[in-house]
A protein has these predicted regions:
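Glycosyltransferase-associated regions of secretory-pathway enzymes
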Residues: 1-64, 80-236
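Small-residue hinge/turn detector
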Residues: 65-77
Length: 236
């Protein structure tokens, strides 16, 4: 598996401080990996209707849902959302004898209906799971016939594709024919999820594309300013 981290960054603009903090962990913990940035122009060049429709609506995350599978399918390596904060290397996972590896995404202990982790996964070039995901999206449109948006998220789509190969929503390691799924504890899906000894990182779910209520936006803005000050102090 190549030591490449694929990152999608659409819409231009600088990385927010929360993303910079996450990328710093990648560079510090994985100095031997190169970061491959996929832009909106790269995404549009694929000529996939679902992607183009999502880009036209400025729904970057949904366009990225497809590009991430294309990146790993065509080049191999590791895909990570920009808000993955690493705690440690994952050499043991990358060395697993599997063509595609991801994690369960059980955000709360009482969740029974959960999907697969789309914020971070890895695979070899030409792996079958990414191929099947691309085939799935090739039949989809982001815009429905009535003009509404198709907002089914990729963790659920991944689960549906994996279910054809024996996947069931049980938070344990599963080695299936075209993918391996690791327990949620190996990658925290949310801040509130407890950190285990073998946890490699956390999905911080910055979600800068989301529309939030005014009160929540104010709270997030204050948190952002505090992180910006702390980041500036730490990087003097």
């Amino acid at each position: 598996m190549p030591k490449t981290i694929h990152l999608c960054w659409f819409g231009g603009g600088d990385y927010p401080v929360e993303v910079k903090a996450c990328l710093d962990t990648w560079r510090r913990i994985l100095p031997d990996y190169k970061i491959r940035v996929w832009t909106g122009d790269d995404a549009r060049a694929l000529g996939i209707p679902y992607v183009n429709e999502a880009l036209d609506c400025r729904k970057w995350a949904f366009a990225c849902d497809v590009v991430r599978f294309y990146a790993v399918y065509t080049e191999g390596g590791v895909y990570m959302d920009s808000d993955i904060f690493l705690y440690s290397r994952f050499d043991d996972i990358a060395a697993t004898d599997a063509d595609f590896i991801t994690f369960h995404e059980k955000c709360d202990p009482d969740h029974e209906d959960f999907g697969l982790q789309a914020a971070m996964f890895m695979g070899v070039k030409g792996n079958r799971f990414c191929r099947e995901m691309l085939d799935h999206y090739a039949k989809e449109h982001f815009l429905n016939e009535d003009g509404s948006m198709n907002l089914l998220i990729s963790p659920m789509r991944m689960r549906d594709v994996a279910s054809r190969h024996g996947y069931v929503a049980e938070d344990r390691e599963m080695r299936l024919d075209i993918l391996t799924v690791l327990p949620t504890r190996r990658l925290k899906p949310r801040k509130r999820y407890p950190r285990s000894k073998d946890c490699i990182g956390e999905h911080r779910v910055v979600g800068s594309w989301r529309k939030r209520p005014l009160g929540r936006r104010i709270t997030k803005r204050i948190e952002h300013l505090w992180r910006a000050v702390r980041y500036a102090i730490c990087h003097k």
